[in-house]
Amino acid sequence: KINNSIETDNFHKKKEFEDIISYSRKNSSNIHLIGLLSDGGVHSHIDHLKEIILSLSDVKEKIFIHAFTDGRDVDPKSGINYIQTLEDFCEQNGGELSTVIGRYYAMDRDNRWERIHKAYDLISNGKGKKTENFSNEIKESYANNKTDEFIEPLVKLNKNGNPIHQLKPDDTIIFFNYRSDRGRQLTSVLCEENKSEFGMRPIISNFYTLTEYDEKFKKAKPIFKSKKLKNTLGEVISNNNIFQLRIAETEKYPHVTFFFNGGYEVPFEKEERILCPSPKVATYDLKPEMSAAEVTDNIINEINKEKFGFICLNF
């Protein structure tokens, strides 16, 4: 849908961009674009970011970009190339790269709020290593065997030695990831949910996501609204009065629930769910079995009950 709108020259005609420009002018406020900077095509695409910048060309001097380096869906040391590509594009078309951080922190989906906090502090408070050149910092990270996924927070300085951006309550944020699962946590603390126990609270009310991240979100507005799918397998099973079970560990939980149900977060009637916590390790190569044993124990127990006519499991 997004790519088609670009190809048919309809992307920049979206009313949401008109609203964002109008809001920015009315409030004399900035626009912050946040998301994964790569062309991996799993969570985001750099071409979408470019189109957003072009769509906001009327206020291009107000655009600041907060990039998450990838390293998982693309080469682990390709982030420097994407950053240089973006900086060249911005020089010609407007916008300015303001902060950089690895997706390990900004795109957690397993309730590791201490990771999200790093991204939150970077975007909201400019808390990170100060630099005048992102490429030099990333080269140094590579030299220290720290690849794109794990890039520590970086903040661009202006000619006066101050961070080039300062997020204010009247600003706008656009999260340009199109896949929802790794965008929810950061979105929630920036505009939806108070996480004071982790030092985070909502600070932006004018918040947009490229697609719908969570139907429970009240403030985050999707630019491309979800198409509600009918007669998914889970719905058909439910309509036939068959009990069904969804089971996975937290890292894979959205795949057997939200995604499997065609974008519906709420369980169908007679659908039950079991969530096993994923291990609390820095990276899963330290515990490659993850929570397979716990998932197995749970599923054996449920199978022996002979209650469910359908089981969806993800190790």
Language-model regions, residue ranges each:
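Feature captures the catalytic ectodomains and active-site-proximal regions of enzymes
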Residues: K1-F315
